[in-house]
Amino acid sequence: HTLVDHKDKNRSNNRIEKPHDYSEIVFSYVVSSQKKRDYCKFIKDIVERRLKTINIDSDAQTFLPEKESQVTEIEKIKENYREAWRKGEGRGNQESDDANRYSRPDYIKMLSSKKQKAHYSYSGFRQLVNISSGIVRHFLEPLSKMYEEQKVKNNGEPIIKIDDNIQNIIIRNESIDFFKEQFEHLEKEVDKNDIHEEKIKKLKNLITVLGENFHEILLSDLSERRVFSFTISDDSNVDKE
C-alpha cells in the first residue's frame, strides 16, 4: 500500500501504523523530474555502497544492465524521432522530447504486434528504480533475490552483474506475488461477510481494468501516454457505502 502524508487509519478496530502496515511516499517524488533524479541517485548510492561491502567493483548501471537488444532497438526508434524533429515533424519543443517520450512505448507496441510475441524486458538499473515507485524496499528486496539467483547460476564464479533475464523474471514474479498477497492480506483483515467479499472482488476487478486501460493508452497514439491519475465521471452506479 502507498499512502501520501497520512499518519494513521483505522482498520478492523486496530490502528494502522507505519512502517509495518504501509509504505509512505510523497507523490511528487514519483512524478517530479528533479525528485525522480534525487531518488535515483539515492538508490544508486545505496547499491554501490552495498556492492563495495561485498567486494564487487561496479557501478549500479553496469551491475544491473538492461537487455542489450532492447536498448539497441529503442535507440533506433529514438533516432527516428530525432530525425523527424529535425525535419520539423516533431511534437516536442526540443529534439530529445519525442524520442524520450515515445520510443519505449513504441517499442512495446512493436513487440505486441508480432505474431510470435517477444516479451518486454523489465531490466536495467533505471527501470528497476522506476518500478520501485519511490519505495526503497521495493527496489532492494527484488535485488536481493536477483543476487541469490545469480549466485546459483554462477556456481561459485565471481558475480560482476545480474543477467537481464534474471532481473526480468524476478520483477515479473514479484509483481504477480505482490498483487496476490495484497488481496490475501485484505481478505484476512476484513470481517467475513458477503458485503466485504463482494467489495474486495470489485476492487480487484477495478485495479485489473485500470491496468488494462493504462496499457491501452501506453500503446496508443496519444500525445501523453503516461497516466498518473484518473476520475470517475459517471458514478451513478457506484456503491456509496
Residue ranges of each PLM-predicted region?
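The catalytic "switch" region of P-loop NTPases
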Residues: H1-K117, I166-H196
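Winged-helix-like regulatory helical subdomains adjacent to P-loop NTPase cores
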Residues: S113, K117-Y122, N130, G134, ...
